[in-house]
A protein has these predicted regions:
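Exported/periplasmic cell-wall-interacting domains
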Residues: 1-118
Length: 118
C-alpha cells in the first residue's frame, strides 16, 4: 500500500475506546473510502506488532464463496448502542460478554467476549 492509502482501524474522531459509531464498524468488509484498508482493532494491532515498516503486503481479492488462501473470518456486527470495537483488548471482557449475551454483538465470540482467534 503506497501513497495516502493506509491499513488502519476504524477512525473514531477522538482518542477514546468508546467513540466508535456502530454504522462505521458494520461497514468492515465493504468499500467505504478512497482505498484504505479498514480493519478491526485486533487486526490492526496484529499488523502493527508483526509487520515491520516497509514490509511488502500482498492483497488477495476474495469473497464469501472464494475467501482466499487464509479463509474468511466470521463477521462481527454490533448494535447501534455499542460504541466500541468488540476486538479492542482495552475494553473489559465483562463488557463484551454482557453485550454479546444481550444480543448487541453478533458473530463468533468466545464465552469471555473475545473474538475467536485473539
Amino acid at each position: 500500500v503506497v501513497g495516502n492509502v493506509y491499513f488502519h482501524a476504524i477512525a473514531v474522531g477522538s482518542q477514546s475506546h468508546y467513540a466508535l459509531r456502530a454504522s462505521n464498524y458494520n461497514k468492515l468488509g465493504s468499500a467505504a473510502s478512497a482505498g484504505c484498508i479498514r480493519m478491526t482493532v485486533a487486526d490492526a494491532k496484529w499488523l502493527y506488532d508483526y509487520a515491520a515498516v516497509g514490509s511488502s503486503v500482498k492483497i488477495e481479492k476474495g469473497n464469501s464463496k472464494k475467501p482466499g488462501p487464509l479463509g474468511k473470518a466470521a463477521t462481527i456486527k454490533i448494535a447501534e448502542s455499542i460504541n466500541y470495537d468488540p476486538t479492542d483488548p482495552s475494553v473489559p471482557a465483562a463488557t463484551k460478554k454482557k453485550d454479546y449475551k444481550a444480543g448487541r454483538i453478533s458473530g463468533y465470540m468466545t464465552s469471555k467476549g473475545k473474538k475467536v482467534g485473539y
